[in-house]
Amino acid sequence: LLSFITVFISCTESDNTIDFVLENYEQGAVIRTISSEGDYNYYDTANSIFSATIEEHDTESGGLMQNVEIYVGFNGNESLLQTLQPGEFTTGPTGLPRTNIKVSFADAVSALGLSPSQYTGGDVIGIRLKLNLTDGRSFSSDNVTGSMTGSYFASPYAYNMVIKCIPLSAVPGIYTFNMSDSYGDGWQGSHIKVTVDGTTTYYGIPSPYESDADRNALLEPFSGNDSGGTAKLTIPEGASTMSFEWNSGDYPSECAYTIEYTKLDGTGQQTAFNESSVAAGTKVLSICE
């Protein structure tokens, strides 16, 4: 799409790279992604927002831009969500038009005509940009080369949002903690702390050392040996809040665990959390009912 004069430029000379791009490409246009962030949560469509800062490049430093269309797609179907006009862009630090786009999960599924029963965790909502120029040309993800989607331009024109299932309240079910210790001498004080409606329980691999007797006494029943095993937690119907937290004891680098979830009737088995390099703090589970 863009023609460049052959030149050697250091990867660290970002300003020179920008100057070269602006001065030497002869044709075409791109949308450069400056930054992007956001998640789509099945349980919170209104507050699940994808945002990105984008920058438009053309031979007239933005003068050729007619508009930028934002499409959303799901399972092969696509709908136009929004059209950005040049007036919605401001001049960025490189002298080129920049703007911030936001696409909420709620707006995406509304534009696509989807109900919650038609999508679930692991499904993908696609967001696609189309740059239209005043000379009649258009550029999008279906007509850009690999050199444009990576490197300096970071111009994919498309973003895939995987739907996550992050609970906003307690999810009734059976939680199985599959725990392991690489050294084979228990977790020595490390544990998973779970609080449900203000009641706290602790899960871990008991240590074989007498000095850890008091810490072992805090743990819920465990089935296994010093190298690994399981423990279970049942969260009943009607529970309001739940939180999962990792607290480190001695040698936490030896510890790893997964949390498997099933509904109270044993159906819907799935991995809600997996951590092989443990880190202290609250853990966010993904549970798709």
Language model features: what each stretch is:
Residues 166-289:
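Loop and turn regions of beta-sandwich accessory domains that flank beta-strands and are enriched
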